[in-house]
Amino acid sequence: MAAVDDHLVRLDAGLLLLFTPPFDDTVLEPGYIKGYVPGVRENGGQYTHAAVWTVIAFAALGDGDRAAELFALLNPINHARTPAGAERYKVEPYVIAADVYAEPPHVGRGGWTWYTGSAGWMYRAGLESILGIRLRGTHLVIDPCIPQAWAGFRVAFRYHDARYVIRVENPHGVSRGVTALELNGVALGGQAGVPLVNDGGSHDVRVVLG
C-alpha cells in the first residue's frame, strides 16, 4: 500500500491510477489495454473498480484517515465543486464514472457513466469498510474505521419492520477499536454483533471506540 501511495495516488489531480506509466510504444504486447490511448481507462487511467478497492484495503489496515481521504477523492461530487472542475470533469457529478482520464490534455475528465459496478463497491466501501456496518445473517456487525478527527456518527438501520438507531462515539480520537457495545442500554459483552429481531420496534445501539 505504500507503493500505491507513492506511485498511484495523485491528490493534485484527484486521481487514483490503475498503474503507471501507461503503455504506449512497447515491443511486448500487454493485451487489449494497449488499444486505449495512454491514460485512458485501463491503460494507466483511473479505473474506478480498483480505486475503490484501495479504499477498502486502507480501511482493512486500520487507516481510517487515508480510507476516508481517498473515498472523498473518488466521490464524483468533489470533481465538480467549481465551474473549472465541472468543465474539466465533463460528466455527471452525481454518479460514479467507470474511469477518469489521467494524461494531458484530458487529465481529470470522466469517462463512462451509468453502468459501472464500481458504484456498488463505492457504496460498500463507505457503509461496510469506513462506517463498519455489516449484516451477517441475523446479526449486525459494527466495526468502524473512521478518521481520527471524527467525534462519531449516527446511522438508522431498518431490519424488516424494526428500526435500529446506531450511535458511534469516538471520545479518544481513534480510527478503529470497539471498546463497548450496547443494545437498548444493555452491554452485549463478547457477542459477535447486535442480534436483530423483526419486532416492529425501535432499538438503540451504542458503540464506543477507544
Tell where the protein language model's regions lie, with residue ranges.
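Acidic, mature catalytic/reactive cores of soluble proteins
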Residues: 1-210
